Curated annotation (Swiss-Prot):
Binding locations of GTP 2: 219-226, 266-270, 331-334
Domain KH-like: start-end pairs: 387-471
Protein name per Swiss-Prot or TrEMBL: GTPase Der
Domain EngA-type G, residue spans: 3-167, 213-386
SUPFAM superfamilies: P-loop containing nucleoside triphosphate hydrolases
């Protein structure tokens, strides 16, 4: 699961600036105005190839009133959700009563806390941060200037890296999506160094076709997740009970359909009391991301009345990054006019054309229209993701693909693809070996992926293709002249000179 790091501190200490620096984005609004961040922002960052989730929160002063109370509540809950906390303080303002209050709260949490003194540019850092050691939160106060990036790299590599490595395993920016933005989710040029024993163990641990299906219902707030979950459970008339899962704050609901056992991962909180405040609903983002990691199949719900939003694309990006099988459900379909339905279908083709492997269903969770057909696609996606494929089969398909369409030239030489084998399941991973295989253009990589999908009849699951260059046995060896070659030939043939 992806580790979670929360940025916490007083208003205007630079949390949003650091958030943008870590996520390499401008998702968080930044201005010299206290309280600008009201809702929590979520983004993905990476340190030494270890991804993690960053939460930007509103500031905590201790004397909040009105809407500021809600902001403070969000910040406190962010601390509970996080695996580690970056406690930001202002080196220019010095230690304040609000800092002491936040520190008192953090001491009660069983979290890894890092004190980060921001805005050290233009001042003597060591002198300015000395008083923050009195907070008693760790041995170090990390000095940074988030606006200029000073000290941020050291903060990541020295402080965060060891803990991120321990906490989790396996970016999607908001905005208009295109095929190229998600290519990394399907293709990899990293060398695969598994031994046969390691590969066999890896494949044994993968889910089998007849296993339970862990189905996570994913979507933005108010798209109908709770309604659909209730519809699914109501149709099956199962006894609903809470089964605590390994993923924090998710509820696992066992059910059965047509002889297949399912575990429905509820991220919508359908059993919460009606008087739960709206603030609590805003904390479902972390639950959703962790449910994606734990699921076999993700059912992504899109609101037909609002169309495809940036948040939909972000959730889709997390699903693809995790390699999970995918089914799309466009909800609230029955309330649209014909011209609106045509507009939504056009938008789906335009913005989500790169996930043509996913089945799309147009449903009404409220009335149950089309809900029953979702199971067929979920089952199909799971079976495709867990289908066992032999080395002989994937190599034969590779030969057929190369015969139908030769790889392009690279530096005047034809790229040769030699053989392929399975590297894992859920999602299916195919490893292709060849000379200069990593030099294949993206267009040919997509051709191979589509060829494999069609040949293996896989729908509903992404296919990841990894390329590995075959070592040249003559690389690095000295080229011999004719006389030297003749001497070696005589020696190997037992020729003796008189």
């Amino acid at each position: 699961m992806l580790p979670v790091v929360a940025l916490v501190g007083r208003p205007n200490v630079g949390k949003s600036t650091l958030f943008n620096r870590l996520t390499r984005s401008r998702d968080a609004l930044v201005a010299d105005y206290p309280g600008l961040t009201r809702d929590r922002q979520y983004g993905q960052a990476e340190v030494e190839e270890h991804p993690f989730i960053v939460i930007d929160t509103g500031g905590i002063n201790g004397d909040e009133q009105g809407i500021d109370v809600k902001m403070a509540e969000q910040s406190l809950m962010a601390i509970e959700e996080a695996d580690a906390v970056l406690f930001l303080v202002d080196a220019r303002d010095g230690l304040t009563a609000a800092d002491h209050g936040i520190a008192d709260h953090l001491r009660k949490q069983n979290k890894k806390i890092f004190v980060v003194a921001n805005k050290i540019d233009g001042i003597h850092g060591d002198s300015a941060v000395a008083e923050f050691y009195s907070l008693g939160l760790g041995e170090h106060v990390h000095q940074i200037a988030a606006a200029h990036g000073r000290g941020v790299t050291q903060l990541l590599t020295i402080a965060l890296t060891p803990h991120i490595e321990e906490l989790g395993k396996p970016k999607v920016e908001e905005g208009e999506a295109s095929e190229g933005e998600f290519d990394d989710a399907f293709f990899s040029d990293k060398d695969v160094e598994l031994t046969e024993e390691e590969l066999a163990k890896k494949l044994e641990d993968e889910p089998q076709e007849n296993d339970k299906i862990k189905l996570a219902i994913i979507g933005r707030p108010n798209v109908g997740k709770s309604t659909l979950t209730n519809r699914i459970l109501g149709e099956e008339r199962v006894v609903v009970y809470d089964m605590p899962g390994t993923t924090r704050d998710s509820v696992y609901i066992p059910m059965e359909r047509n002889g297949r056992e399912y575990t429905l991962i509820d991220t919508a909180g359908i059993r919460r009391r009606k008087n739960v405040t709206d603030v609590v609903e805003k904390y479902s983002v972390i639950k959703t991301l962790r449910a994606i990691e734990d699921a076999n199949v993700c059912l992504l719900i899109i609101d037909a009345q609002e169309g495809i939003s940036d948040q939909d694309l972000s959730l889709l990006g997390f699903i693809l990054e995790a390699g999970r099988s995918l089914v799309l459900a466009v909800n609230k379909w029955d309330g649209l006019e014909d011209h609106e339905k045509d507009r939504i279908k056009t938008e789906l083709d335009r913005r989500l054309g790169f996930i043509d492997f996913a089945r799309v269903h147009f449903i009404s969770a409220l009335h149950g229209t089309g809900v029953g057909h979702l199971y067929e696609s979920v089952e199909e996606a799971f079976v495709s993701a867990t289908k066992r494929i032999s080395t002989a089969m994937v190599t034969k398909i590779l030969d057929m693909a190369v015969f139908d369409h030769q790889p392009p030239l690279h530096q005047g030489r034809r790229i040769k693809l030699k053989y392929a084998h399975a590297g894992g399941y859920n999602p299916p991973i195919i490893i292709i070996h060849g000379n200069s295989a990593k030099k294949l253009p993206m267009s040919y990589k997509r051709y191979l992926m589509n060829y494999y999908r069609k040949s293996l009849k896989m729908m509903g699951t992404p296919i990841r293709i990894q390329f590995k260059d075959t070592l040249n046995p003559f690389a690095g060896k000295k080229k011999l002249n004719y006389t030297e070659q003749k001497k070696i030939a005589r020696a190997t043939q037992g020729y003796k000179k008189d």
